[in-house]
Amino acid sequence: MTYLLVFLGGGLGAMFRHFINTVSGRMLGTAFPYHTFFINVSGSLVMGLIAGYFAFKGGSSQHVRLFLMTGILGGYTTFSAFSLDAALLYERGAVGLAALYVLGSVALAIAGLFAGLALIRAIT
């Protein structure tokens, strides 16, 4: 049942993401990645709202959390999970580890992308 909830939520999140990509491209153009910027910021905002609500106003079932946070937000943007992880490290007092996580994730993700591009260029 949990996999089905994540699957269904992920599909909805991906549809929302595609909608934002399409609309922002038409409205703002494609010279700057407004769509990704908006998705990352809005997804992180919603993750904060949901996580904060569950933490401060009372929990909810694991099924609801999986559907909303892992499913919908995971399909919409994984940046929200990244932001939550960084915030949790910071709030636990692991400021240095949070900074390392943020800088390392961004730098290694970009390096990984360039490595993938270089590899595919080399073999094609």
UniProtKB/Swiss-Prot annotation:
Activity control: Na(+) is not transported, but it plays an essential structural role and its presence is essential for fluoride channel function.
UniProt keyword annotation of Transferase present: no
Keywords assigned: Cell inner membrane, Cell membrane, Ion channel, Ion transport, Membrane, Metal-binding, Sodium, Transmembrane, Transmembrane helix, Transport
List of residues binding Na(+): 74, 77
InterPro entries linked: FluC
Keyword Metal-binding: yes
MF terms in GO: fluoride channel activity; metal ion binding
Subcellular location: Cell inner membrane
Membrane-crossing residue ranges in chain numbering: 3-23, 36-56, 66-86, 100-120
Superkingdom of this protein's organism: Bacteria
Catalytic reaction list: fluoride(in) = fluoride(out)
Gene Ontology process terms (BP): cellular detoxification of fluoride
Bilayer topology: Multi-pass membrane protein
A GO CC term attached to the entry: plasma membrane
Pfam families the UniProt entry points to: CRCB (PF02537)
Family: Belongs to the fluoride channel Fluc/FEX (TC 1.A.43) family.
Function: Fluoride-specific ion channel. Important for reducing fluoride concentration in the cell, thus reducing its toxicity.
Record's protein name: Fluoride-specific ion channel FluC
Organism: Rhodopseudomonas palustris (strain BisB5)
